[in-house]
Amino acid sequence: MLCFLDDIQKVYSIVNPNLTDGKHVMAQKGDEETISFVDVVLGLSREENIDLYVTGSNSKMLSADIITEFRDKATNIALAPLSFQEYFNYVGGSASEAMYDYIQFGGMPLAVLKPDEEKREYLKGLFETTYFSDIIEHNTLRKSESLDELCNIVSTQSGELLNAEKIANTYKSVKKEKIDKQTVEKYLGYFKDAFIIREAKRYDLKGRNEIGALRKYYFIDTGLRNARLNFAFPDEGQMLENVVFNELVYKGYSVNVGCFDTVEKNKNGNSIRKTNEVDFYATKGIRKYYIQVSADISNAEARAREIKPYLLLNDEVTKLVVINRPVKESLDENGFTIIGITDFLLKYI
């Protein structure tokens, strides 16, 4: 028998009725003999022929809390908005048109069912009344301008290499006031715990190890990111990266930002160290991909920029350039695969 319990963690704990002549007495802080929702769930889990699922708000319990409260007696199932493949399976039609809508509005299931204008209002409300409210309630915060502004900064700079210091400096330039790095790191942790953002760490493609404090942040849903910015026209490259990152994570890949150093000559003939970047280094078992994501590479300068890191990498990892154009998968003269984003998401990975 399937049994779903939604928001049971919001119920109040009571004193053990054996100590209160069977009466239900609300537990107070410090009471030892209490019965909480955890006890109820564990009791139900011991019943035969019950497949038990517990859902609810992040304001009361985060995924990290599940491990603490239930120890080895529960499995955490990560749920996410619809991937592009799931979204396209539902809406059908032109893959390119579906991608355009998906970049704007994301894959929140209820948003998908609504007309465009209602999608905008729904996603704005979802961000404020669910995601932000959960952060404030779970961490006993007062809704503050600093929390708001930091979320705006991460939204605007999604897909850029960031650390707490860079974000604090941006905050200072925007708000004309200081915020310490510890507060920035704490708030970033809140955003991650509430499943607003995920992070991609830098990975040295030659040293084969994660490096440094710089990392990129991507929204778990592009619609939520755009709602945060009032649906101002997004940077196409950033949003494409976000979609590709999410799809790779959905498909079980470990995803990092690839980087490596080379020594080059500047215009004065002096040797300088230069850091090169590959948008993503994605691995899953024996599958390994370098992935560059671009809106378009028909311009010679853009093409040269995207393939330059690949010309400097002499290894056997599959090298891909994913573009937002309906092109057939092809190999260029250097052996790199060029593929349209919809084919990459729907057929390749």
Per-range role (PLM):
Residues 297-326:
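Basic, amphipathic alpha-helical patches used to engage nucleic acids or provide basic targeting signals
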Residues 48-49, 57-161, 165:
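Interdomain motor-coupling "hinge/lid" segment immediately C-terminal to the ATP-binding subdomain
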Residues 29-34, 43-66, 191:
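Sensor-1/coupling segment of RecA-like P-loop NTPase cores
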Residues 325-349:
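Domain-level recognition of nuclease-like catalytic cores that cleave nucleotide substrates
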